[in-house]
Amino acid sequence: AEAVISIHFTKEFAAQAPDEFIESCLFSGGVEVKGLCVGQKWRFGAGASGDSVFLERKAREKGFAFVPVDELRTPEGMIISSTAIRKALAEGNLDLAAFMLGRNYSLFGTVEEGYHNATRKLDSPTANLHMMAGILPPNGVYAGFAHVDGMRYPAAMNLGVSPTFRAEYGRIDRRLELHLLDGFRGSLYGKYLQAELVSFLRPERRFANPEELKKQIQNDIEEINRILERYHV
């Protein structure tokens, strides 16, 4: 896209009638729309009173092209929608979410300092991303890729609250820990990072001691390497 216009959603904006919505969003502030493409069932305006029939009539009046798009479905017949994508992610169904998105789901954030458990106790240095409220898959271990400084690295990822170390640190905020498996040299602190989630391995769980967790991490890494072999980095 050459430009993106962000509109602040307010009560006044939500109360606009469809006609007001068209004028304020498509024909004001230097914007004069030439064509509009929306989903066939898209609704807008107060009380969702605007629809594709209204837009088709308005397009003739204002002289812009209007292209309604039919619903897209998965091969199993499921309608592809933001609601369906959120549900797939909440259930940890990354394959379905990726099919509907047309790409693997990613999380983004700036690498911050963690508790150093992975480095000091597990010999497995990680990059930590604090997870804000939003659309997140279930806590657990994932195979994926870390994108940083224009490069893509295979990575083992853990989303969760590090239950094995909770007795030592008390409450631990939910975070994504990434262990880059190959090729990266240097420090990640302060860098903006994209975590591309490819496959869910197992739920997060509490281990009796760090040594048990360390053994499981090695098993996880072996499995993750097998999963990511089919991808070219």
Protein language model regions, located:
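N-terminal alpha-helical segment
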Residues: 5, 78-81, 193
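A conserved beta-strand->alpha-helix junction
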Residues: 1-12, 70
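Classical nucleotidyltransferase
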Residues: 12-124, 147, 208-214, 218
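Phosphate/ribose-recognition catalytic cores of enzymes acting on nucleotide-derived substrates
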Residues: 62, 114-233
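Secondary-structure boundary/capping signal
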Residues: 3-4, 63, 105, 232
